[in-house]
Amino acid sequence: MDIYNDKGLQTIKLFNNEFDCIRNDIRELFKHVTDSDSIQLPMEDNSDIIENIRKILYRRLKNVECVDIDSTITFMKYDPNDDNKRTCSNWVPLTNNYMEYCLVIYLETPICGGKIKLYHPTGNIKSDKDIMFAKTLDFKSKKVLTGRKTIAVLDISVSYNRSMTTIHYGDVDIDIHTDKNGKELCYCYITIDDHYLVNVETIGVIVNRSGKCLLVNNHLGIGIVKDKRISDSFGDVCMDTIFDFSEARELFSLTNDDNRNIAWDTDKLDDDTDIWTPVTEDDYKFLSRLVLYAKSQSDTVFDHYVLTGDTEPPTVFIFKVTRFYFNILK
C-alpha cells in the first residue's frame, strides 16, 4: 500500500517481505534484552544492516534523490494489556520535496492485537506489518491481547527529486525524471551512429527493471509502434529491429564492455518482471507526448552506449541515448 499527500509526497508505505534479509540480524542485536520495554542501540553508519535498509528504500520508494537513516535503532517490546496512548505529531516538512519518517520493522508479531493505528486524513489505517509512515501523522500502538510484539524503529529522512517535466496521462500527470532511483520504467530515445549493418537511425524503447524492452517508436523517431514488440534485452532489439539482415544472430552476439544495461546498472536488474504495455488510447497519447519531449531534449540530455559484436575484428555499435525515468500509476 502506498499513500501520498496532496503534494505527491509519500506518507505511508506498507512492506511485504522486503526486510526478511535483515530481520534475524536485528533480532540478534537485541537478543539479550529481557528487562526493558525500550532500548536504543547506536550503529555504525556503514553497517550492513543500515546499508541494506538504505538499498531497500531506494528500490521500493519512488522518485528518491537521497535516503538518510539515523544510525540509532530503537528496540520496543509490548506485552499484553500495556497501555499505549496516541502520539501526536507537530512536525511539518520544511520543503515540498522532503519528508521524515518512522520505519517500523516487526521482530515478533503478537497473536492478537498490537496493530499500529495511523490517523490519516482520508481514514485511519491499522497494520501489523513492516511499515514506514510520515512524522506528520499521529499514531498509536493498539493493546497486545495475546502474545508479544517487538519492533525495531528507525528514523528516516528522504529527499525527493524534482521532475524534469510532467506529462498528462488520462486524468493524472506523470513526473518525468533523469534520475533512476525509485523508478520502474525508462524511456530511451536512441540515435544510432551510421553503420553499414544498421537499418534504422532512430528508435525508442521502454525498458523495465528486468531489462525487457518495449519498442515504442522507430525509423523517423516519432511514429508510435502499435503492435506490441517486446524483447528480453536491448541486444535483442538490435537483432530484431535495428540490423538490416536476419542472419545477424547467427554471426555474432553483443555485449557491453562495462557490463551496463542500456537503462539500468546490470547488477540491479530484477528477474522476470512483466513490462508495462500500452492498451488504451490514453496510453498511446502518453507515449506520443513522451517521445516528442525526449526528442526535443535529445541534443542536450544524452550519453553514449556501446555494444560490441564478437567478430574478428570486433564490430562496434555506438548509440546516443536520451533517458527519462518514470512510474506508471497502477
From Swiss-Prot:
Top-level taxonomic group: Viruses
Family indicated by similarity: Belongs to the poxviridae C4/C10 protein family.
Protein name: Protein C10
Species per Swiss-Prot/TrEMBL record: Variola virus (isolate Human/India/Ind3/1967) (VARV)
Organism lineage string: Viruses, Varidnaviria, Bamfordvirae, Nucleocytoviricota, Pokkesviricetes
